[in-house]
Amino acid sequence: MGKKSKASKKRLAKLERQNSRVPAWVMMKTNRDVQRNPKRRNWRRNDTDE
């Protein structure tokens, strides 16, 4: 594990933001058409290619 560069840290921060569930209000607004986030990722199981 070396030092994280600023660019690498920025990419990891973006992946962390993307790794969240679909908000409840979106599910309500779309009448549950949108229920899951296909970009969900587990920190232990899935790789980020970073």
Curated annotation (Swiss-Prot):
- InterPro entries the UniProt entry points to: Ribosomal_eL39 (IPR000077), Ribosomal_eL39_CS (IPR020083), Ribosomal_eL39_dom_sf (IPR023626)
* Keywords in alphabetical order: Ribonucleoprotein, Ribosomal protein
GO MF annotation, one: structural constituent of ribosome
List the residue ranges of the region (Disordered): 1-20, 30-50
Which residue intervals are annotated with compositional bias (Basic residues) in the record? Answer: 1-12
Domain of life, source organism: Archaea
GO CC terms, sorted? cytosolic large ribosomal subunit
A Gene Ontology biological process noted in the UniProt record is:
translation
Q: Which family does it belong to?
A: Belongs to the eukaryotic ribosomal protein eL39 family.
Protein known as: Large ribosomal subunit protein eL39
Species annotation: Halobacterium salinarum (strain ATCC 700922 / JCM 11081 / NRC-1) (Halobacterium halobium)
